[in-house]
């Protein structure tokens, strides 16, 4: 029996939880390209992803899901097209404590527009325990105003259960049957 390999992309702004989410769910120790932050990113976290993160989930003996996390910094956007090749879907993580998370939605949905027009997207909002507004309904309405439909969840990127829920929602949206 041949191996089935699937690829899911995690994206979002610096500090939204991409590296943490992949580490929470991966069956292997994630491969990261974190470096010490040297720009305005330093105010959000001491290290930042400069190329990608990689993790792996073994669903069965012959089925794997490869997890790729993008850098949240725009200057590394040349990697984004490379990482989406062969991907089945996008998980957009948003930090609810950022100044304008709707600007983050605009930016990332525009940057990945070609990909999400062909594939599915799921949105996970982190740090809602620290900042309740905007709420999940606000995110859904904003996505609809951009002519986008995607499930939106309140998630803790450190939680295996929450990240599993995002992946299951993405896989279900691909094949609800």
Model-derived regions: residue spans:
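Conserved G1/Walker A P-loop phosphate-binding module
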Residues: 1-46, 56-58, 66
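Charged helix-capping and loop-helix junction motifs
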Residues: 105-109, 136-138
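Inter-motif core of Ras-like GTPase G domains
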Residues: 76-98, 112-116
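Conserved catalytic network of the ASCE P-loop NTPase/AAA+ motor domain
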Residues: 2, 49, 58-60, 82-86, ...
């Amino acid at each position: 029996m041949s191996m089935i390999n699937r690829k899911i992309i995690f994206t979002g702004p610096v500090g939204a939880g991409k590296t943490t989410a992949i580490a929470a769910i991966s069956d292997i120790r994630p491969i990261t390209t974190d470096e010490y932050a040297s720009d305005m990113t330093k105010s959000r976290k001491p290290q930042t992803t400069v190329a990608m993160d990689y993790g792996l989930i073994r669903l069965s003996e012959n089925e794997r899901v490869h997890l790729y996390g993008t850098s949240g910094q725009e200057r590394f956007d040349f990697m984004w097209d490379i990482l989406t090749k062969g991907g089945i879907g996008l998980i957009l993580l948003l930090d609810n404590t950022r100044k304008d998370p709707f600007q983050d939605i605009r930016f990332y949905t525009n940057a990945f527009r070609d990909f999400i027009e062909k594939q599915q997207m799921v949105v996970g909002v982190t740090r809602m325990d620290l900042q309740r507004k905007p709420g999940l309904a606000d995110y859904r309405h904003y996505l609809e105003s951009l002519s986008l439909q995607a499930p939106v969840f309140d998630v803790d990127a450190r939680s295996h259960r929450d990240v599993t829920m995002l992946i299951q929602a993405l896989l279900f949206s691909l094949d609800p049957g």
